[in-house]
Amino acid sequence: MRSDIIKEGPERAPNRSLLKATGVTDSEMRKPFIAVVNSWNDIIPGHIHLNKLAEAVKAGIRNAGGVPFEFHTIGVCDGIAMGHEGMKYSLPSREVIEDTIELMVKAHQFDGIVLIPTCDKIVPGHLMAAGRLDIPAIVVTGGPMLPGYVDDKYTDLISVFEGVGAYSTGKLSERDLKRLENLSCGGAGSCAGMFTANTMACVTEALGLSLPGCATAHAVDAKKARIAKESGERIVEMVKENLTPRKIVTFKSFENAIMVDMAVGGSTNTTLHLPALAHEFGLNLPLEKFDELSRETPHLISLRPGGPNFMLHFDRAGGVQAVMQRLSSKLHLDQLTVNGKTIGENLNEFEIINPKLNKEIIATLEKPIHAEGGIAVLKGNLAPNGSVVKQAAVDPKMRVHTGPAKVYDCEEDAMENILAGNVKPGDIVVIRYEGPKGGPGMREMLAATAAIGGMGLLESVALVTDGRFSGGTRGPCIGHISPEASEGGPIALVKDGDMIEINIPERVLNLKVSEEELEQRKAAFVPPKKEVTGYLARYQRSVHSANTGGIVD
């Protein structure tokens, strides 16, 4: 066992003495040491229950003859960090989480790890650590929260964000906004739609790194506690089998994960996280692969924010395994999973509990919701290296649109003008200097897009940015524009009134300005300087472009 390096032989008497100070017995010294990597904290709704899941995991480890050791990682709530300076720290936290897990596991020579994350950047941070460390690992994602219920319909956090826009135009009273605020987030768990956290949980299950059914089992569901305990039991067997992440995850696994992502209409943030994750597995996953598979993989389930259904409905309809069953003719069924079985073997054992709901909300390949997958990659002279849009959440009227630019150099300026009514139907809002280096930190523009949505403008106004979007964003919102403005990308050269062409079916994003004019603007371009200190200064120096996953050297 790896852990023998800290507990075997007379020269390790001091190490054993310290372990015994924690209560470890001589008999436990002969058992596998399993790290339980918990991202529990008191401020993230998606994480407030993870202490209980960790206890279930540890019980499972003990049941199977292992010795659990729990330690914690940090976590940022994107919803609480949204719309202000705090969002600059969300994406950078991904690598900090990964690094801290590596430090703890390497320093203490654990035999295996159980990773317990829930929310947006925390799941990819844990997954990236698993790929980098390559010791037996299993992931227990924390599960979605229950949706709210207001005015006789289900609600979620996006209902509240869009309520702000509706309130600003007088469409919603202060009382009604307060009701949304009070009742839309139902307690423990990740936000209730197919936003980034739940997308990443689905991707984790599709990659084979969590047990079947884990992604959609809700935070308050006893099923989640059982999966946590079973994961603890399974990790001990994985240590004995030496079944490591790189034996499970291959390039074909990533293709499976992307196809599931496309079928469920997942968050555009996967185009950042999956390439970064592939990098830690020693693989190259180009942005173009997402578009290739999107053209081949239909959108099969209409979930929030692009449709009426919530994660609760998805779970009852069968969750990720049900979608993979629909996609089985396209998937690589020979890929291994953490339970030691292949994707195909798991699907053969999968049982649909609610056949009526399964049929109602998960479409078939023959009659999909949309013929193409949830995400499209656009290129053109405004985004030579690519940009992304959640096409499954775009109104058909806005899939092709040309309009004048309204240019803002930060999210705050854009938000002020949107709420002041300065953005009109037909406009294309441009928010720049919000990329990985320019922000720094590549903030999400959910406050801006939700305000536009709440004001009823998503059928007439588009937004393009070198920043990114929440998984809760809907509408013609195009992000991750590469190269970004701070690196002299064409988005830095856009002026108010310039015409921008968006054509999602043709995958085009063009600035309708002559090459000669653009060359003149480029010659005069001087990027603005921002005062950046602390961790963000280090991040700014080492982060790469969004089209390669925003990885950090």
Curated annotation (Swiss-Prot):
Modified residues (N6-carboxylysine): K121
Catalytic reaction list: (2R)-2,3-dihydroxy-3-methylbutanoate = 3-methyl-2-oxobutanoate + H2O; (2R,3R)-2,3-dihydroxy-3-methylpentanoate = (S)-3-methyl-2-oxopentanoate + H2O
PROSITE patterns (alphabetical): ILVD_EDD_1, ILVD_EDD_2
UniProt keyword annotation of Membrane present: no
Cofactor note: Binds 1 [2Fe-2S] cluster per subunit. This cluster acts as a Lewis acid cofactor.
GO cellular component: cytosol
Gene Ontology MF annotations: 2 iron, 2 sulfur cluster binding; dihydroxy-acid dehydratase activity; magnesium ion binding
Entry binding sites for [2Fe-2S] cluster: C119, C191
Biological pathway: Amino-acid biosynthesis; L-isoleucine biosynthesis; L-isoleucine from 2-oxobutanoate: step 3/4; Amino-acid biosynthesis; L-valine biosynthesis; L-valine from pyruvate: step 3/4
Keywords: 2Fe-2S, Amino-acid biosynthesis, Branched-chain amino acid biosynthesis, Iron, Iron-sulfur, Lyase, Magnesium, Metal-binding
Transmembrane segments: none
Pfam families in alphabetical order: ILV_EDD_C (PF24877), ILVD_EDD_N (PF00920)
One GO biological process term: isoleucine biosynthetic process
Domain of life: Archaea
Cofactor: [2Fe-2S] cluster; Mg(2+)
Catalytic machinery residues: S470 (proton acceptor)
InterPro entries, A to Z: Dihydro-acid_dehy_C, DihydroxyA_deHydtase, DiOHA_6PGluconate_deHydtase_CS, ILV_EDD_C, ILV_EDD_N, IlvD/EDD_N
EC number: 4.2.1.9
Residues that hold Mg(2+) according to the record: D78, D120, K121, E444
Subunit relationships: Homodimer.
HAMAP family, alphabetized: IlvD
Role summary: Functions in the biosynthesis of branched-chain amino acids. Catalyzes the dehydration of (2R,3R)-2,3-dihydroxy-3-methylpentanoate (2,3-dihydroxy-3-methylvalerate) into 2-oxo-3-methylpentanoate (2-oxo-3-methylvalerate) and of (2R)-2,3-dihydroxy-3-methylbutanoate (2,3-dihydroxyisovalerate) into 2-oxo-3-methylbutanoate (2-oxoisovalerate), the penultimate precursor to L-isoleucine and L-valine, respectively.
Protein name according to UniProt: Dihydroxy-acid dehydratase
Organism field: Methanosarcina barkeri (strain Fusaro / DSM 804)
